[in-house]
Amino acid sequence: MELRDKHRADAKVLESNSTEDGQPGSPMNSNQQNALLIHNPNAGNGGKARRPLLDEARKILATGGIEAELVETRGPGDATEIAQRATNEGRHLVIACGGDGTLNEVVNGLAGAQNGHRVPLALLPGGTANILAKELNLPWDIPGAAKKLIHGEVRDIALGLATPVNEPEKKRWFLSVAGAGPDGMIVYAVDLDLKARVGILAYWWQGAREVLRYKFPHFRVIADNVSIDSSLVVVGRTKNYGGPFKITTDADLFEDKFELMTLETQSGLRYLSYLPSLWFNKLRGTDGVHFWKADSVVCEPLDSNPVYAQVDGEPLARLPIEFKIVPRALKLLVPQDNATHKVRAVA
């Protein structure tokens, strides 16, 4: 049997040990694993300084039976192509090291695989926001995260799928959070050179500019027999939103639902007044703020004002857009303290 064929056979064994309802599955250290480590050297502020940490992490992973080959991205979209190649090669595991954008690219490569081989995903934090790392309680230091992963288990989780109604070819999977309104505008308008220099502060700077010039147009949010005209919607798969903020705090990565949050106001000053409530996690119950859960949501413009959307902090398209849950769309390697999480089965 060729080595590549053996990898495919072993991967099938790994998948069969992971349950289909999202319950705890196969320990990663049960067999020797052939992994691909996808590193974005431009993510965060690490650059070349991150390479020795990755070498240390690879040694740690090897002690747990995970042999990780390191591949670096060279530009936008590269991580998606590399992840797709990993599925074709029959890899046992893909490890992403980069920011939320890198992670989103890898997710789109794995979830979009055409050969039916579902390769589990793992994460080593390397970006500015690291939303998923926070959600999984992973240390932000790369070797520390590697130590957690070798004792983790593979879980089936749902993904969000965002489809622009007028440009369905631009559909994208997302793992953490999507949104439409001012956050989409900020993501579209942020200075990428500034982001490379100062990280997440670039979004704060762009947000301050948008408060002064954005029109906050209303659009319609339709989900679970609820229809609300809003200036912002957050479509959460995770509790963490970005930076220090948690918005959709009842969201559960292991549940087949979004938590939605909408704001009605069209006033930039009112948005600023929400900041203390956001900082202290007191948005629930605030006038004009709505939370509820759904497995699909449609956002439609009400006039000619463009409303932009983002997924996992990356620009998507203008409304109208449909966001929907796709159960068991991804296999995720989670640390032990998340692996025993109790999951409510969703039909």
Which residue stretches match the model-derived regions?
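Glycine-rich phosphate/pyrophosphate-binding beta-alpha loops
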Residues: 179, 183, 234-247, 315
